[in-house]
Design a protein with these regions (language model features):
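Alpha-helical transmembrane bundles and membrane-interface segments of multipass inner-membrane proteins
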Residues: 1-153
């Protein structure tokens, strides 16, 4: 579903937003069509095949991890699904055209797409979940109380 929503929004942006900017919240949120051959914030521009290889390796690792059932809890699986769906959405663009379509613009920050949102929030929530899932690991463990030694034994 993530891949479908991502690809649909990219299709709609390409069909309706080329050369246009639609302001949704002045100064904060716009829809604006651009293409990007890099990653978030236009980093590593022109590295199409690096991203293709990195995504293919990521997908292979995810398949291995899922087969091994290392992630067993629902929150972990939802986060992995979000990251993977976003990665596949951008992977499709890179394979087919070499460019990723971005359309969600925060004027003072960046322009990105639905896949980027799922990758970012999936990764963020996964880190938060991992850091908070076992509160005993983060909390100070109570010190063991010494038992009085029985001198009569």
């Amino acid at each position: 579903a993530i891949v479908a929503v991502d690809q649909l929004t990219k299709y709609l942006a390409a069909a309706n937003l080329v050369g246009k900017t639609v302001t949704l919240i002045p100064g904060w949120l716009q829809l604006h069509y651009i293409t990007n051959d890099g990653m978030a914030l236009s980093l590593l521009r022109g590295a199409r095949w690096l991203f293709v290889v990195m995504t293919a390796v990521y997908l292979a690792v995810v398949i291995y991890v899922l087969v091994k059932k290392w992630f067993k809890k629902t929150p972990e699986l939802w986060c992995i699904a979000a990251i993977t769906g976003g990665a596949i959405g951008n992977f499709i663009d890179r394979i087919s055209t070499g460019l990723v379509i971005d359309m969600i613009c925060i004027p003072w920050f960046s322009t990105f797409n639905v896949a980027d949102l799922f990758i970012t929030f999936g990764a963020l929530f996964l880190v938060i979940y991992i850091l908070t899932k076992d509160k005993e690991l983060l909390a100070d463990k109570p010190k063991e109380q010494k038992k009085p030694h029985d001198a009569d034994a």
